[in-house]
Amino acid sequence: GQVSRSVARTLLLPYMGGVPLLVVDQDRRQEAVVVGSGGGIDVVTLLVAGFENIDAVEINPDFIDIVREQADYTGGIYNDHERVTVHEAEGRSFLRQREKRYDLVLMGLPIIKSVRNFGNHALTENYLFTHNAFTEYRRAMRDEGMMIVVAHYRNELLRLVSNALKSYQEDGIAIEEAMEHIVTIGDPLNPTLVLKQTPFTEQERRGFRTILETIPTRGQLNFVPGIRPAEYQNYQVNPELAAMAAGDLDLQGLAARADEDVSWISDNSPFFYQLS
């Protein structure tokens, strides 16, 4: 069943994959997809947030089997739950093969779920986060749809932003304009990218500013369109992202200012975690 808004807020605030959902309108909580659903935390997050229909896409059948076997612990979210449909599939292929469009695309902590040898993760091909992938995700979103991607640390988030912006650029959309579609939340452990199919409304921007006032963030990694320069310090706004929104910095400039390689990547060289 559904939970009340106040209870949902309490449950969503501790997890960065859920925090942006506090800004999503109630009438845009119909169709959601989790790419790399793993053990199901993102599925539970969407259930708490009140989404009506959730496609849980997981390429590893072992994860699906474990969650089903532990139904008493997991709440049976992979066991014929009335609001969840489980798909054993690769995320991008799944989205390409369907005509369905989503109010929300959620991807949380995929490296922990997919890389057996964490020490070699930089050499692992990952087609989920290339700029080509972001174009496909945008195609899978409804007109007012959003996408949430939870990263692990600062430079992963900046590379996510680079790939998202390159995706827009390939469609002929200028960086300055594309920044109207982007929010970043600089949680110390799980910095998060939020992408919206259309520019964020003033109401949504206010909602994100309220979130930044509520949760602890640090390291100047936040960005919400429309925050005035005088407020940058209060909101821990990232200076590079602010400069891009103002039209004063391009993708090459962002990469040049970073202490690791945060430039965009393509399907031809999909080494997202190769940052050094």
Show the residue positions of the predicted features.
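Mobile active-site "lid"/loop adjacent to the S-adenosyl-L-methionine
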Residues: 62-63, 70, 74, 81-82, ...
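Short loop/turn motifs at secondary-structure junctions
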Residues: 28, 50, 100-101, 143, ...
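Extracytoplasmic/lumenal ectodomains and periplasmic regions of secretory and membrane proteins
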Residues: 230-276
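General small-molecule cofactor/ligand-binding pocket signal
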Residues: 84-87, 183, 222
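Conserved S-adenosyl-L-methionine
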Residues: 172-188
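Class I S-adenosylmethionine
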Residues: 1-76, 81-82, 163-168, 172, ...
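Flexible, glycine-/basic-rich loop-and-beta segments that form/coincide
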Residues: 180, 190-250
